[in-house]
Amino acid sequence: MAAGSTIDALGQFELHPVLGHLGEALRFSQSPLFMLIAAAVVLVFLYVGMRPAAVVPGRLQAAAEISYDFVHDLAVSTIGENGATFFPFVFAIFFFILAGNYLGLLPFSFTYTSHIAVTFGLAIMVFIISILASIRFQGVGFLKHFLPAGTPVWLAPLLVPIEIISFLSRPVSLSIRLFANMVAGHVLLEVFAGFTIMLAGLGAFGHVLAIAPIAINIALTALELLVGVLQAYVFAILTCIYLREAVAH
């Protein structure tokens, strides 16, 4: 939030070099920094939670096992018999997004999933891997998906371009969905936090009025916790669906 009474809800998304002059030289901003932090957090969580495996698991081990089983079941049940092959990729995607969403809720942190460059990069990676999987499992036969079975020949000039556009739009819709949800949630949190600070500066009466935006901010934070995991889940399951289509014969 800027000085005075102005609420700068979009300032939180600005990129600035970190690590001083080294960061400026390397163009190293908060986004890659928090990506590294997120990766480290997930790796530590899994390493500490899974090693050594106790007969009676503790809370951390139970959480790690539940997380592993959840994503594994999601990949296998959605993709099918080849689900185990793509499980590591789906697992990495899910936890990279989840960690980014949740880290962004901490004070003085940065939400890298609120940047379209990041979400589009993830979506393009999913898109390319799904194409490579299509070629690997179906060969040139994957082109038949652009003309549904039983379609009259005279409809082909109309349906094929529509199917191609729909296929090419996947990374766009996948990236915008995550990006828009993260931006909207954090803007609302910043706005109501700004209202709270502004009202608190009005004296005793302002302190009373500040109760409402504080309550709203608490509710929004709880909602963001839910949205954070839901968006990671939606991205992961859509990835699984695209991969299922890619490996289907």
Swiss-Prot record:
Organism listed in the record: Gluconobacter oxydans (strain 621H)
Family the entry assigns: Belongs to the ATPase A chain family.
Annotated Gene3D superfamilies: ATP synthase, F0 complex, subunit A (1.20.120.220)
Positions of disulphide bridges: none
Membrane topology: Multi-pass membrane protein
Subunit organization: F-type ATPases have 2 components, CF(1) - the catalytic core - and CF(0) - the membrane proton channel. CF(1) has five subunits: alpha(3), beta(3), gamma(1), delta(1), epsilon(1). CF(0) has three main subunits: a(1), b(2) and c(9-12). The alpha and beta chains form an alternating ring which encloses part of the gamma chain. CF(1) is attached to CF(0) by a central stalk formed by the gamma and epsilon chains, while a peripheral stalk is formed by the delta and b chains.
Its job: Key component of the proton channel; it plays a direct role in the translocation of protons across the membrane.
Protein's cellular compartments: Cell inner membrane
NCBIfam families: ATP_synt_6_or_A, PRK05815.2-4
Key words, A-Z: ATP synthesis, Cell inner membrane, Cell membrane, CF(0), Hydrogen ion transport, Ion transport, Membrane, Transmembrane, Transmembrane helix, Transport
Gene: atpB
An example molecular function term from Gene Ontology annotations: proton-transporting ATP synthase activity, rotational mechanism
Pfam families recorded: ATP-synt_A
Protein name from the UniProt record: ATP synthase subunit a
GO CC terms in record: plasma membrane; proton-transporting ATP synthase complex
InterPro entries per the UniProt record, alphabetical: ATP_synth_F0_asu, ATP_synth_F0_asu_AS, ATP_synth_F0_asu_bact/mt, F0_ATP_A_sf
